[in-house]
């Protein structure tokens, strides 16, 4: 599978919400760098294969729900799982216990698909690291810093963009943490 620029007559361009986020952040010059896949890439492995990059160069944007954290407003309310965005390299898995400890939460789970869409405005597989409908707490795993450039979803499962990891974390308003699952 190859990629093409996400602009032009045959490509409708980047997701409107994501394009607006780029303008608001003053980085609209990134739009020509957005790449479009001919087929959806809903996993990090599919995206890495299509781009011809290492799996760990893919930045996954994952939404979790946290309960009972003194750091998250409304997380102690009845049914109050508060969405939290975790940015993780594509070769690694998130350790929920480490996320729970980082947030001081009682419980952390993977968010349901409807919560992901409601929180971010994007479908799973296309969630970018910034430009969401609502402001969420962002945790970025340090493993992302192992590359000069990482690729992240640009609002759809068909589009990605490149960015230096520190810039990406900064634009996302993320806090660098160690929440990667360690293998035995």
Locate the predicted segments by residue.
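Extended, low-hydrophobicity, polar/charged segments
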Residues: 1-184
């Amino acid at each position: 599978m190859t990629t093409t620029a996400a602009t032009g007559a045959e490509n409708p361009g980047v997701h409107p919400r994501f394009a607006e986020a780029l303008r608001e952040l003053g980085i609209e010059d990134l739009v020509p760098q957005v790449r479009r896949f001919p087929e959806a890439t809903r996993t990090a492995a599919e995206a890495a294969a299509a781009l011809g990059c290492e799996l760990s160069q893919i930045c996954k944007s994952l939404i979790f729900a946290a309960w009972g954290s003194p750091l998250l407003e409304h997380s102690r309310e009845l049914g109050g799982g508060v969405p939290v965005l975790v940015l993780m390299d594509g070769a690694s898995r998130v350790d929920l216990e480490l996320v729970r400890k980082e947030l001081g939460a009682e419980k952390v789970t993977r968010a349901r698909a409807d919560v992901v869409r409601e929180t971010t405005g994007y479908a799973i597989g296309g969630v970018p690291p910034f430009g969401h409908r609502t402001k969420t707490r962002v945790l970025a795993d340090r493993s992302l810093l192992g590359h000069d450039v990482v690729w992240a979803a640009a609002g759809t499962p068909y589009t990605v963009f490149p960015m230096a990891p520190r810039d990406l974390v900064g634009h996302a308003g993320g806090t660098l943490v160690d929440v990667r699952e360690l293998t035995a």
